[in-house]
Amino acid sequence: MNRKVYTSRLSSFLPNAPVDNDEMENILGYVGGHPSRIKKIILRQNQIKQRHYAMREGNLTHTNAELMVNAINGLFDNEFDANAIELLACGTSTPDQLIPSHASMVHGLLKGSNPIPLLSVSGVCCSAVQALEFAFLSVLSGHTSNAVCGGSELVSPLLRSDMFEEEYRTINQVQENPYIAFEKDFLRWMLSDGAGCVLLTDKPMGKMSLEIKWIESV
């Protein structure tokens, strides 16, 4: 097989203005009305300074599908637009709904796109890589000459303070068993919202095209 696959364009989308660490609980809410006892420990270790949330005043500003569409729109110009996409593969662990699938919802929001093969992948941190592998194999095999794949997550609704009432009722475990308390609070200070995508092509497009030699996910 002599066909080649290139990453010809990249795009990303982060919703709303960045949120500093000191402002996080103003967006997510205070569990039990009090600042987190674990937050500073986690932030000191992960070194994250800012993040983006698709939520303001407790209300969503973007759906997961909208995050992905905004990222995909960043791939387009006069030479390549939605009408030219031959395959769409989307990975996420937090779809807006199960049916229709995440990729179907993204495709439905893409203005000007034709009927094309779709793939929705759910596999936590592996979701986007598995979508990338499928898109890569499609172009490599000659089934399509290009493919758009990406990953998006909308986790902020799951990080709201009202989702952590059980943790608040056992907050004394911070002192009695710090490991358990850290484990419960950990993801709240690690995750945020956003989307990224890549255009794969069978021929280079521009000076920044990089060839993918192989992808293997297990």
Spans of features found by a protein language model:
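Short, well-ordered amphipathic alpha-helical segments that serve as non-catalytic structural scaffolds
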Residues: 34-41, 63-79, 102
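Residue-level signal for short, function-critical loop segments
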Residues: 13, 91-94, 153
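Condensing-enzyme catalytic core mediating Claisen C-C bond formation in acyl metabolism
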Residues: 1-62, 176-218
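Conserved beta-strand elements of the Class I
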Residues: 6, 86-89, 145-148
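Short acidic-aromatic active-site loops that bind/stabilize oxyanions
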Residues: 57-65, 92, 96
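Acyl-thioester C-C bond-transforming condensing/cleaving domain
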Residues: 2, 73-78, 82, 98-100, ...
